[in-house]
Design a protein with these regions (language model features):
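Substrate-binding/charge-relay-adjacent region of secreted/lumenal peptidase catalytic domains
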Residues: 2-93, 102-103, 107-394, 423-470, ...
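An often Trp-containing, charged/polar helix-loop segment at the C-terminal end
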Residues: 17, 440, 489-553
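Short, glycine-/polar-rich solvent-exposed loops and beta-turns at beta-strand/coil boundaries
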Residues: 95-97
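Acidic/polar loop patches that form or flank catalytic/metal-binding clefts of enzymes
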Residues: 237-239, 278-279, 358-359, 394-397, ...
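Short clusters of hydrophobic/aromatic residues that line enzyme substrate/ligand-binding pockets
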Residues: 386, 414, 428, 462, ...
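Polar, glycine-rich mid-to-C-terminal structural blocks
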Residues: 390, 394-430
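Active-site core of glycosidic bond-cleaving carbohydrate-active enzymes
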Residues: 473
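Active-site-proximal alpha-helical segments within enzyme catalytic domains
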Residues: 476-489
Length: 572
């Protein structure tokens, strides 16, 4: 049968350079997504479960109920499996996982299967190399049965959202007044600012805060213990467990940078004290044997967020976290559309199972690249994914106290891929009315707007590799907000009620209750060059989103007040 293109990129995403052809013997593990049944019903069901007042509100689904809902028709799986077998893919290299089929083949076979050529691409910013292609096809008779096959056109530019890391002189161990929090942020600052006080969650096996680790970032126990001794001396018995996904390591002696992991653990665990904390370390490694041509396959063909999402969706109900916080993201346009859709669907399924999925919004303000990659070179603002997925809660950044103001690097804006969900219509329309024609044409005014909320994101004191450092980035705000939600869940479970799950319809429905509206400051961006490569990029003079009354694309609905949110959740 003739081939039909599944996906095509006009050029590699920003920062990636095409190099030599991939070695024919290099093994790649592919994941093929099949069309799911019931996709429209699923969307409605997810919203019903998350909408206060609906009869299904917080009636979360079990793992096996979700699996049954998303399983493709048997005839579909059978036809795709038959194609792989006919093309000579060995049976023991094929794994049928319901919604996905995984298969591992050398590049030479993959090129025949997908009618394409694979090349090595080099990322100028990170030095990473990946085997990818700019387009791939499948035979016409199965084209409608294949949603996507990855890794092909997805260039993983995962970046942790850490901006500034500054070594600190020895820090005094004092009780901190709120005034000191203008200079540095510690757990005490956040406990005062967000009205958490000395709250201690009841120990409950059903409540778990999950922290995502990627890119060989390791959470070190020694650093964590020293952090507790200095900044949470009443909580020195706090702890976390490590769960390895797909061969992820948690190397206690690594000399690699691990500021991201330290930041997430230090604050998520200290602020949700007594809730079980789990660090999920994901390597995204295929079952590959290194050879000369590809000495470290892990760098080349990893798909860490799909690996992590699939692992979590496969967990038994009693092992699932009730909150998952993740501090990384990438330019939305650098992802193949089908990949963004699929991972966003997986976040939605986690929400339906009762997980509050929380992401940092990004550290690029209105954007860095600020130029369309579809060949048009049109100047535009850059939305960040996964923050732009309507099924995650995206957290922007603030700085300073009395009053808090938007931090200039806090990413926000409007998705070019996902339409604006109804739950945020009212809040976002009111902002767009105030904005008028300002920045018209640089953003998609009908897109999903983000962030949803905000929290402190600069000058955090962190212990990393035996040193005190000050860290900034929306990486810091996501675990803080997640810890507050974990505490709300602890109180709900104690009262015999289910946890919050997907948060956004509830958060927007509070109409400002439980939040401090941030009205000072704004973001910046689109400087005209990419800082880490020096290459030219889209330039928008004075590019900015302002923090204003009500929702805005820098601080969302504002910063959380735990004492009010817990009352609202309990219906008081």
């Amino acid at each position: 049968a003739p081939f039909q293109v599944v996906e095509r990129l006009s050029a590699p995403p920003d920062g990636w350079i095409k190099k030599e052809k991939a070695a024919p013997s290099a093994q790649i593990q592919f994941r093929l997504g099949l069309p799911q049944q019931n996709s429209e019903q699923l969307e409605q069901l997810a919203l019903n479960i998350a909408t206060p007042g609906h009869e299904l509100y917080r009636k979360h689904l079990k793992r096996d109920e979700i699996k049954a809902l998303v399983r493709p028709l048997a005839s579909v799986s059978e036809k795709v499996l038959a194609w792989l077998r006919d093309e000579g893919v060995p049976e023991d290299r094929i794994h049928d996982d319901g919604a996905w089929i995984k298969f591992t083949v050398p590049v030479s076979t993959a090129e025949k299967l997908l009618n394409t050529e694979f090349f090595v691409f080099h990322n100028e910013r990170t030095g990473a190399e990946q085997i990818r292609t700019l387009e791939y096809s499948v035979p016409q008779d199965i084209h409608s049965l294949v949603k996507f096959i990855q890794p092909t056109t997805h260039f993983s530019s995962l970046g942790p959202q850490v901006r500034r890391v500054v070594p600190l002189d020895v820090l005094p161990k004092l009780r901190i007044t709120l005034e000191d929090c203008n200079k540095k942020i510690t757990p005490d600052c956040l406990k005062q600012l967000y009205k958490i006080g000395d709250y201690v969650a009841p120990e409950d096996p059903r409540n778990r805060i999950g922290i995502s680790g990627y890119l060989e970032q390791f959470a070190r126990y020694a650093d964590f213990e020293e952090f507790l001794e200095s900044y949470a001396p009443d909580r020195t018995d706090a702890n976390f467990t490590v769960v390895s996904i797909n061969g992820g390591r948690n190397d206690q002696n690594s000399t690699l940078d691990s500021t991201e992991a330290s930041l997430d653990i230090d604050y998520a665990v200290t602020l949700s004290y007594k809730t079980q904390a789990v660090y999920y370390t994901t390597a995204g490694r295929g079952p590959l044997v290194p050879d000369e041509s590809q000495p470290d396959p892990n760098e080349v063909s990893n798909e860490p967020y799909m690996e992590q999402l699939q692992f979590l969706l496969d967990l038994p109900d009693e092992e699932l976290p009730t909150v998952l916080t993740t501090s990384y993201g990438e330019n939305e346009q650098s992802l193949p559309g089908s990949y963004a859709d699929e991972t966003c669907n997986m976040f939605r399924l986690l929400g339906m199972r009762g997980v509050s999925v929380i992401f940092s919004s990004g550290d690029w303000g209105t954007g860095i690249v600020c130029k369309a990659n579809d060949g048009s070179e049109r100047i535009k603002f850059d939305p960040v994914y996964p923050a732009s997925c309507p099924y995650v809660t995206s957290v922007g950044g603030t700085t300073g106290v009395n009053p808090e103001r938007a931090v200039e690097f806090s990413s926000g804006g409007f998705s070019d891929r996902f339409p604006r969900p109804k739950y945020q219509d009212e809040a976002v329309r009111s902002y767009l009315t105030k904005l008028g024609d300002h920045w018209k044409g640089l953003y998609n005014e009908s897109g999903r707007a983000f962030p949803d909320v905000a929290a402190q994101a600069d000058n955090f004191v962190v212990r990393d590799q035996g040193q005190w450092v000050s860290v900034g980035g929306t990486s810091a705000s996501a675990p803080v907000f997640a810890a507050i939600i974990a505490n709300v869940n602890a109180e709900l479970l104690k009262a015999g009620k289910p946890p919050l799950g997907f948060l956004n319809p509830w958060l927007y429905g509070l109409k400002g209750r439980g939040f401090t509206d941030v009205v000072h400051g704004g973001s910046t961006g689109c400087p005209g060059t990419v800082p880490w490569t020096g290459l030219p990029a889209g330039h928008v003079p004075y590019a900015s989103w302002n923090a204003t009354e009500g929702w805005d694309p820098v601080t969302g609905l504002g910063t959380p007040l735990y004492d009010e949110l817990v009352k609202a959740a309990l219906g008081k």
